[in-house]
């Protein structure tokens, strides 16, 4: 599976190191946001990597909504709690990082899931430098390009 080098499984939990997360952001998503640099003071795992892991583990449904609830730091053991129509990505303390709602037919076709995942995260990774930054500049909005912090709630 193409995601294997971007996380590990320890005692039944998914664990993502800062280096693994950063490599995914840069190599797969084309996302060079400094917050995904392994040595960033406010490092966080890219939501796109969690999105990709959910699809790889649980398949792709016709309708899916991903709600990002918390920033994920490095090396947090994650569990995936699945019900009929939801998947929660959380830690052992119960802190939820992503809530996924899904409905409709589900495919587990690995080739299709990888193709869709790669296409989606490649577009998502370019969202900040190619879409948001020019839009903000054209509207006279100031931000620090060395430390951009763009957060979104859902996709």
Region annotations inferred by a language model:
Residues 1-42, 63, 73-76, 81-134:
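Catalytic strand-loop segment that frames the active site of acyl-thioester-processing enzymes
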Residues 43-65, 118-155:
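Active-site helix/loop of acyl-thioester processing domains in fatty-acid/polyketide metabolism
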């Amino acid at each position: 599976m193409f995601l294997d080098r971007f996380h590990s499984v320890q005692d039944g939990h998914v664990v993502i190191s800062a280096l693994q997360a950063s490599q995914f952001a840069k190599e797969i998503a084309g996302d060079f946001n400094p917050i995904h640099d392994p040595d960033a003071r406010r490092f966080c795992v890219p939501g796109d990597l969690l999105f990709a892991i959910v699809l790889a583990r649980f398949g792709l449904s016709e309708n899916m909504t991903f709600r990002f609830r918390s920033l994920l730091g490095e090396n947090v053991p994650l569990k995936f709690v699945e019900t009929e129509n939801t998947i929660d990505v959380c830690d052992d303390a119960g802190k939820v990082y992503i809530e996924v709602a899904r409905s409709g037919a589900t495919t587990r076709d690995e080739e299709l899931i990888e193709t869709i995942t790669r296409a989606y995260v490649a577009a998502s990774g370019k969202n900040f430098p190619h879409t948001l930054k020019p839009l903000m500049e054209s509207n006279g909005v100031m931000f620090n390009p060395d430390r951009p912090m763009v957060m979104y709630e859902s996709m």
